[in-house]
Amino acid sequence: MSLISRLKAVVAGDDFLDDDFDELDYASEDEFNGNDDLKQNYKKSNALSNSNPFEFMNNNRTSNVVGMPGIANSSSEVNLMEPRSFDEMPQAIQALRERKTVILNLTMMDPDQAQRAVDFVAGGTYAIDGHQERVGESIFLFAPSCVNVTSSFPEEASPSNVSSKKTSQYKFETNTTPEPAWGESKLSAYN
């Protein structure tokens, strides 16, 4: 077909000269009626379009709710751990995530590793808005946010420990400024 005849057909509105329509295959009505899957899909799509769109959204929202571990049961658990190495610290973090209180007795660890362990578990406790307390020498309490930690020291408040006469065990001389670590100071006001 020449360019001029094609332009005439387009301007005249003659759609029969377009060859693309001849290649389309149409499904016969018998094939469409025989396919049950298409009917079921059509019924489902109509049911969704006729339903309330807000009701459909509310059904999806309830499926996104995730329960917190440890909330369903009303009993509390306390884990007492005596780790020997830093490798056991993720167990303490996992217990805190499960909303369990953890008491760490770090007397069996090297002091440097114990400091590292306390920093690690304290960071995990802070991340879950928990609480931490030092209970004793190398013994620490870490609790999740659902546990209230209060501290009171009855041995300091008891009258048997309070002495009536306050005496100082330190004796001060007239010059109370300490010597600087780098040697004599010429700028001292007490010289």
From Swiss-Prot:
Subcellular location(s) of the protein: Cytoplasm
Residue span of region Disordered: 153-191
Transmembrane segments: none
Record-linked Pfam families: SepF
Protein known as: Cell division protein SepF
Family recorded in the similarity comment: Belongs to the SepF family.
Keywords for the protein's UniProt record, in alphabetical order: Cell cycle, Cell division, Cytoplasm, Septation
Chief place of localization: cytoplasm
Entry function: Cell division protein that is part of the divisome complex and is recruited early to the Z-ring. Probably stimulates Z-ring formation, perhaps through the cross-linking of FtsZ protofilaments. Its function overlaps with FtsA.
Positions with biased composition (Polar residues): 153-178
InterPro entries: Cell_div_SepF, Cell_div_SepF/SepF-rel, SepF-like_sf
Subunit comment: Homodimer. Interacts with FtsZ.
